[in-house]
């Protein structure tokens, strides 16, 4: 449910940012997307009432966007804050009970979500570059840096000790749509004159993001299973140490009583 909410918020961010920077009329698309975002957040609220603050924050942000009281950079940064707060919930959910220790698998899952975040921003920026070259003056370095961040995160997860999650990500990188998307990202970094139908790029990159979203969901399930196993083991360990300490205490008490008794009540010869 959290991953779905993040997905919808990222989509809304892309449309909001595109509309703000270009002359495109995306009001209908934005309205439809906001409804989808609201539906995802509503489901999330059924599970966690703390997300009401996220809903309020988003409502204020939308009002600023609609009334043009916000810059394009602020649009991105404010949506990133919302996504980050939801990612933090993943940490809170996937923390071993009463130990407060975040699972290593959870850290890997969060990295995949962050990679997806970078990919979503790349889709938005390159879409704008295809629609309106002037809208992205000076953004080439940003595209290059986002792509570097994305690759760094993906490489870290693939080389991690969590074999199951690493294998999931390897399969994602080998998908044909994924290869096409990143070939074009590299082309956008090398060339100033991009020749591609904007709708085709949006379709390809969106499919890749959806594939990565599915990978995130599967990785989250793996992390949850790992958490359950770790929690069960933690409970067993705690019970073992509890009974062990009780046994030691009983043995010590027995020896103390024996010694005291022998001192004050020596055996008669």
Task: Briefly describe each language-model feature range.
Residues 1-249, 253-265:
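Hydrophobic alpha-helical segments
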């Amino acid at each position: 449910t959290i991953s779905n909410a993040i997905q919808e918020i990222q989509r809304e961010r892309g449309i909001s940012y595109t509309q703000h920077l270009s002359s495109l009329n995306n009001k209908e698309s934005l309205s439809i997307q906001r409804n989808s975002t609201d539906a995802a957040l509503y489901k999330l609220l059924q599970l966690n009432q703390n997300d009401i603050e996220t809903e309020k924050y988003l409502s204020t942000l939308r009002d600023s966007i609609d009334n043009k009281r916000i810059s394009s950079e602020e649009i991105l940064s404010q949506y990133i804050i919302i996504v980050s707060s939801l990612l933090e919930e993943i940490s809170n959910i996937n923390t071993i009970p009463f130990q407060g220790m975040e699972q290593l698998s959870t850290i890997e899952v969060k990295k995949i979500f962050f990679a997806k975040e970078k990919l979503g921003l790349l889709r938005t920026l390159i879409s704008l570059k295809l629609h309106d070259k002037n809208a992205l003056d000076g953004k080439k370095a940003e595209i290059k840096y986002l792509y570097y961040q994305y690759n760094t995160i993906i490489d870290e997860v693939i080389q991690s000790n969590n074999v199951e999650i690493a294998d999931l990500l390897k399969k994602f990188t080998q998908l044909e749509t994924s290869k096409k998307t990143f070939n074009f990202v590299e082309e956008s970094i090398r060339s100033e004159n991009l020749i591609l139908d904007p709708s085709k790029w949006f379709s390809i990159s969106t499919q890749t993001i959806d594939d990565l979203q599915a990978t995130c969901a599967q990785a989250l399930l793996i992390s949850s299973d790992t958490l359950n196993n770790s929690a069960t083991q933690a409970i067993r360990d705690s019970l073992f140490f509890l009974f062990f300490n009780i046994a030691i205490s009983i043995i010590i008490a027995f020896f103390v009583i024996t010694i005291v008794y022998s001192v004050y009540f020596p055996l008669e010869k």
